[in-house]
Amino acid sequence: MNTILAQQIANEGGVEAWMIAQQHKSLLRFLTCGSVDDGKSTLIGRLLHDTLQIYEDQLSSLHNDSKRHGTQGEKLDLALLVDGLQAEREQGITIDVAYRYFSTEKRKFIIADTPGHEQYTRNMATGASTCDLAILLIDARKGVLDQTRRHSFISTLLGIKHLVVAINKMDLVDYREETFARIREDYLTFAEQLPGDLDIRFVPLSALEGDNVAAQSANMRWYSGPTLLEVLETVDIQRAVDRQPMRFPVQYVNRPNLDFRGYAGTLASGSVKVGERIKVLPSGVESSVARIVTFDGDKEEACAGEAITLVLNDDIDISRGDLLLAANETLAPARHAAIDVVWMAEQPLAPGQSYDVKLAGKKTRARIEAIRYQIDINNLTQRDVESLPLNGIGLVEMTFDEPLALDIYQQNPVTGGLIFIDRLSNVTVGAGMVRELDERGATPPVEYSAFELELNALVRRHFPHWDARDLLGDKHGAA
């Protein structure tokens, strides 16, 4: 047990009291991102080190690892605290998304350390999808680079509103204020093109030396702002899902015996109370909440983010993937949508392709109808393309095999975010964020000849493993 943890437990009056206090602290999920070798892993290591979150055995192991794999000479290589894969240590880079947990007296934190290399942009998008804040590291010697722009855009695309631009390695530019001011101006010029109302803050620091990370730097007296840790402890995170209407995707039908039938899942947004009238989509059947069951017992009310089991007053047909919402809410299922896509596969995404898509607990098939444009990350302009390559970001028009209850991603990431799954390998090949709904709802139905319909029926009957589309079903759906 480290010293600060032992002291905190003693101050709280024992382990049980300390654990209760931890439960009432707010939680901040953030990621570090930026270009290659900007010092992301070193910064996380410095945060853990300076907040005394490293145990004695970890510190001893870090000394040994620094001698074998370190890149800082006689100094501790704090990046090794996070770079856990052997390939990462041998190459001195981050490959996988590494998660670390720590807490201070004011807040709990979950950190996602994401790769800087362009070929691992998909890993970075994975890490950003659950975060509230992004720390964008910039090497003071290099300034704003393409990966800085790419990661900034992906972060905002995935709904992150709080950006902390950490201008690192200030020790290598003699802590000059003019270097900080120039990079700040360059980034603000670029950020004017980013979507949404963003909270952007700038901190000059040295992760290697510890300047302005957890303690104020004596080398940059010209900077009067907060340290990085102070920003993380005090930033006000207003989650949009708390203010959105109630959405409860059913993940599991819980029926341990004949006397109990509940619907388990995580409340995606809003709140739900015992006695509240709810509606089930896609069926539209209504009922009311009889019980809200949790691990700690029954509750009268549950809020967004809580894992609960809902018991209803009526026995109605509900299965995995259905969506529960307030009875007075209207959410029309859609078959067509425009989706912002981050593509993660070697094979490009092209019109005409079909994929399995998973949205909350729902899994269905979708067809790529068109690619409106790909985003040029360097200047955030739109350009016409025939396909979306690996790590490409663009807006895609899709048609689902069945109507889905969807929200716009910026309003509700759970019911507006989806993943693409290759139907042969079952590998996740892309991430999607709903931008527009029913964009092609007024498109006239496609007319198929009798021969085309008969051939389609024959293929579907005798070769079901081909997963051919039901043209007759498409015709009826469009009509």
Swiss-Prot record:
Residues 206-208 are annotated as: G5. GO terms for biological process: hydrogen sulfide biosynthetic process; sulfate assimilation. It catalyses: sulfate + ATP + H(+) = adenosine 5'-phosphosulfate + diphosphate. InterPro entries: CysN_GTP-bd, CysN_II, CysN_NoDQ_III, G_TR_CS, GTP-eEF1A_C, P-loop_NTPase, Small_GTP-bd, SO4_adenylTrfase_lsu. The keyword Methyltransferase does not apply. Residues 34-41 are annotated as: G1. It is an enzyme of class 2 (transferase). GTP binds at residues 34-41, 113-117, 168-171. Residues 168-171 are annotated as: G4. Its EC number is 2.7.7.4. The keyword Cell membrane does not apply. Residues 92-96 are annotated as: G2. GO terms for molecular function: ATP binding; GTP binding; GTPase activity; sulfate adenylyltransferase (ATP) activity. Keywords: ATP-binding, GTP-binding, Nucleotide-binding, Nucleotidyltransferase, Transferase. Residues 25-239 form the tr-type G domain. Residues 113-116 are annotated as: G3. Pathway: Sulfur metabolism; hydrogen sulfide biosynthesis; sulfite from sulfate: step 1/3. With CysD forms the ATP sulfurylase (ATPS) that catalyzes the adenylation of sulfate producing adenosine 5'-phosphosulfate (APS) and diphosphate, the first enzymatic step in sulfur assimilation pathway. APS synthesis involves the formation of a high-energy phosphoric-sulfuric acid anhydride bond driven by GTP hydrolysis by CysN coupled to ATP hydrolysis by CysD. Heterodimer composed of CysD, the smaller subunit, and CysN. Belongs to the TRAFAC class translation factor GTPase superfamily. Classic translation factor GTPase family. CysN/NodQ subfamily. This is Sulfate adenylyltransferase subunit 1. The gene is cysN.
